[in-house]
Amino acid sequence: MTDNQIRELFDTVPFFVDNPIEVLRSSRFIRSMSHCDSASVNTGLIYGTANPVYQGMTWREFLSHGKKMKKNLDRFTVNPEYYLSHERSGTPPFFCFQDGKGYVAEDGNHRACIAKFFLYAQPSPLLHGVHLVEVQTDARMENLFSRLKRLLPP
């Protein structure tokens, strides 16, 4: 999708458009975990996904080639208010925020991508009514564990 096409849809071309979609990595050492069935997430803090199909694509590539993107973009052009509303119909997007970085954990990759672009130019970057799991990991323990594994024979 060209800059002009993105600008036509969202009024601006966000800085992250050519950033790669990151991988949600599991951690062996979790300090805390919380869950909320109806949360609001800052779409500016969404960096990636658990879905291997989209990992490594840029946000621009995903906007252009996502499996259900055309259908979701058509819905967006008819009803952009969906992305501003506190109400959700159907299955809400499911996010995991791990150590402050957001990832689409299950459902909602296409909607999250559109929300990330659309809400970038809005007064509030918050997407409401989503499922959310927040995880804080112990990076120090993860590092120690990795170092210890390297010391052990194969």
Where are these predicted regions, by residue range?
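Short alpha-helix boundary/capping and kink motifs at helix termini
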Residues: T2, R7-E8, V13-V23, R28-V104
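A short, basic-hydrophobic beta/loop patch
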Residues: E87-R147
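Primarily interfacial, aromatic-capped hydrophobic alpha-helices that serve as membrane anchors
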Residues: R147-P154
